[in-house]
Amino acid sequence: MIVAILGAGPAGMSCANACLSFGLTPVVIERHAQVGGIQRANFHENLWMLGSPGETGQSLTERLAEHFHSLAVRTLFRTTVQHIQSAAQGGFDLQLRSEGQVASTLHTDAIVLCTGMRPRATPELLALADASTRVVIGPLNAVIRDHMCAARVLILGGGDNALDHARFLAERGNRVTVCTRTRFSGRETLLAACRAHPLITLRPDCRADTFMAQAQGVAAHWPDDEQVEPFDWLLVMFGYQPNSEVVTCFDPAIRPERDARGHVQVDGWLRTTVSGVYAAGDVIDNVQPAVPTAIAQGLAAAKAIERGRHHGGQVPFGGLNH
């Protein structure tokens, strides 16, 4: 039984490993040249992986990748899915395009969506980041660690990541302004630490309406001030959004449903609304998105496929309760 796994982050690698144990044949499809997903750029300590105190996301990813590469798993790198349709003989036909190669078709019996998530930003801020290297989208960027020193930094966002990075940067001599459109929603301990730090300014109900790229930074214009305020760096911390656009590659008749925030909808067995299609990791709505969560769900998705096979085929969304 062939299982196509879309994405080679922690969820995808875990799913492939588990498929082998369950007698399934995984084929991993990864659009980048490496495994690991966004954790490849995570220089922060991973607080959620029990048994690995002090280990960064990058180091953890290296360990996962080393194990994954030791497995007998067919992995298609630099490959994107162009279209997915039901196959006449059952299962699915995936039209693939690999970099530098002609288009190809892969027939599979099941599909697992493990495409992860990416930092969220408005189209205007994404365009600004394309125009200026002084604009950083999201927390997983080594520029934050290696190049922001004794500088003026503006952080947009009011959650844990925004406050945690304000503290991280202030401790390295940066003067940090944190701007959120409403109130701060981060943990109270982080908020208290930021309030107490002399190099951090917190601005709730702050609605900067214009940002302009400059030679050595970014200028921000506040609606209540006729002047612009210069910063050396702009850091956008608006959280994350799921990489669920892959569902648009499915034929409309078999397109998995998404919720209002774009997460792929699944039941307790990680089955989507389409029989034979599963999803795991950050592409679905999790109580706590984290590497351990993704690893566990990759395993669970493989188990669900194996269990469905022993129940006479794929079980529909919400079924197989026992």
Protein language model regions, located:
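A Rossmann-like FAD-binding core segment of flavoenzymes
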Residues: 65-108, 171-263, 307-322
